[in-house]
Amino acid sequence: MFDTLFNKVPELSILAEDLGELRHQVYDLRDHYHLKGMYVFQFHYCYDFDFHKVVVYTGTHDNDTLVGWLDSLEKEDYKKVSTYIANYDEVHDYQKIIHYCLDLEAMHVIVPVWDMMGCDTSARFNVPGKIGSPNWEYRLSSFEQFDSYLEDYKNMLEVSGRKGV
């Protein structure tokens, strides 16, 4: 199937959701077709990765927000995370994590809006296994709410060499 797909659309880019415990055949298939995998900071911050093979995420739609996640960390885990972001000057740890992710060598970095705005757990988009409200209902009340954060991220993008990407 992938052979046919890539023969018909050679420039096609596919992202493989390669999270969790997977059989080696999944990784073999991903690598054979040069599919991008996923690096999610909340899961992988203490693991080595080939960042050219992944799309970097601060978190996904199934994770807590960065602020909520940081608040829930055990002391030892928080110390580990702190070692990765110690050299960043941003005021808040969630911003330091975003900057760290932008500095990684991955071509693409995805940062959910609730992470960019430093939202707490109350803004969590989805809790797997939970049905109904408030899952899948996150909304900005206005873009003005988001505008105040743009200058900080513009600077991070510049410093990380991602401006215009």
What are these regions (language model features)?
Residues 1-165:
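Catalytic cores of glycan-processing enzymes that make or break glycosidic bonds
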